[in-house]
Amino acid sequence: MASQPPPPPKPWETRRIPGTGPGPGPGPTFQSAELGPTLLTRPGQPTLTRVPPPILPRPSQQTGSGNLNTFRPAYSSFSSGYGAYGNSFYGSYSPYSYGYNGLGYNRLRIDDLPPSRFVQQAEESSRGAFQSIESIVHAFASVSMMMDATFSAVYNSFRAVLDVANHFSRLKIHFTKVFSAFALVRTIRYLYRRLQWMIGLRRGLENEDLWAESEGTVACLGAEDRAANSAKSWPIFLFFAVILGGPYLIWKLLSTHSDEVTDSTNWASGEDDHVVARAEYDFVAVSEEEISFRAGDMLNLALKEQQPRVRGWLLASLDGQTTGLIPANYVKILGKRRGRKTVESSRISKQQQSFTNTTLIKGATAADSLDDQEAAFESVFVETNKVPVASDSTGKNGDKQDL
C-alpha cells in the first residue's frame, strides 16, 4: 500500500510575514514593479506619494473669463463691428469682425499637449516684442475704426438733417394747400381796399404796402441763401474737426492706459505692496493666461483689489516681469510684504522729520543767543544813556553854584 502524502500544514502551524512572498497569505505586497529592486521599503507598509490637489475649472472654461483681458490684451477686441452705425449706405459691414481665429491659428490649444520647454522659453523671450507690435497694430486699427465711425456718424447726421428738411418742406406744402382755401378772403379784402381807394378814403397806401412786401420778400430770400450756404459747409468743418481732434484724444487715452497698466504691474517686481506665497506642488501652464512653477518657488501675488474675479485662480508673477494665473490650492500664502517704494517713502519721511526736529532745535538755540545779545545791547544802551544825564545834572548844579 502506497504511502499517502503528508497533509498540508495548518494555518496556526506556519508563521510567515505578510507581503514577503507569493502564495496565499493575509495580505498582498505593496511594492510596485516600476520602482525596481533598489527601493528599500519595509515589508507590509505602503509607499506614500504626495498627490497634488485637483485643479479647478480653468479661466477659459468659466463664465466671465473676459475680465482677463485687463492684463492680457488680444485681438478679439476688434470683433464688435459697426452694427450701431447700420444704415442704407453702410449696412452691417464690419471689416474687423474676422479677429485672430480667421487665420486658422488657435493660440489656446487646450485639447493638445502642452508645448515643450523650448517653445515656452521662445514665447517668453519674444512676448515683449510681439506685444509692442500688437500695440502698434492696435493703434492703427483704432485710428481706422475711428475714421470709419466718424464718416458713418457724419453721414447719418447729414441724412437726418436732410430728412428734417424734407419734412419741413412737406409741412410747408400742406400749410400752403390749407391757406389756399382762404383765397376768397384775400380777394374780398383786396376788393374792399380797392373800393376805399376809389372813393377817396385811402390814398397812397397801396404803393407803400407793395414796397414793404417787396422788402420782406428780399430779406427772406437773402436769409434763405445764407442758411443754404452755411448748411453746405458745416459737414466739412465737422468732419475735419473730428479727424484732427480724434487722434489726440486717442493718444491721450492710450498714454493714460499704458501708465495705468505700468502702475498696476509694479507689484510683480516688488515696487508696490504685494503678497508673498510659496509653491507647494509643481504646475505646468497649458495656455498663455497661466504661468508654470515648481514646488518651493517663491511667487509674488497681486493684492485683493487687483485680483481678477476667477474662482480658484490667483494673479501671480514668478520672475517679476511675466504675470499670469496660478491655481490657488497649489500655493501657500506667507503674508503681505511692503513694496520698495513704500519703504523708501517712509524712510525719506522719517529723515525729513528728524531733519526738521534738528533744525527746530538749532533755531531755538540761535533764538536764545539772539535774545541774550539783544538784552546785553539794551543794557549797554541804558548805561550810556545814564552817563550824560549825570553830567547834565552836575552841570546844572555847577551853574547853580555859579549863579
Swiss-Prot record:
Subunit field text: Interacts (via SH3 domain) with PEX14 (via SH3-binding motif); forming the PEX13-PEX14 docking complex. Interacts with PEX19.
Gene3D superfamilies: SH3 Domains (2.30.30.40)
Compositional bias of kind Pro residues: 1-11
Interaction with PEX19, as annotated region: 175-196
GO terms of biological process kind: protein import into peroxisome matrix, docking
Heme in keyword set: no
Biased composition (Polar residues): 59-69
Modified residues (Phosphoserine): S354
Keyword Transmembrane: yes
Membrane-crossing residue ranges in chain numbering: 135-155, 175-192, 234-254
Keywords attached to this entry: Membrane, Peroxisome, Phosphoprotein, Protein transport, SH3 domain, Translocation, Transmembrane, Transmembrane helix, Transport
Family: Belongs to the peroxin-13 family.
GO cellular component: peroxisomal importomer complex; peroxisomal membrane
Subcellular location as annotated: Peroxisome membrane
Protein name per UniProt: Peroxisomal membrane protein PEX13
Record-annotated SH3 domain positions: 272-336
GO MF: protein transmembrane transporter activity
Topological domain ranges for the Peroxisomal matrix compartment: 1-134, 193-233
Region (Disordered): 1-69
Pfam families according to UniProt: Peroxin-13_N, SH3_9
CDD domains, sorted: SH3_PEX13_eumet (cd11864)
Record organism: Bos taurus
PANTHER family: PEROXISOMAL MEMBRANE PROTEIN PEX13 (PTHR19332:SF1)
This protein's encoding gene: PEX13
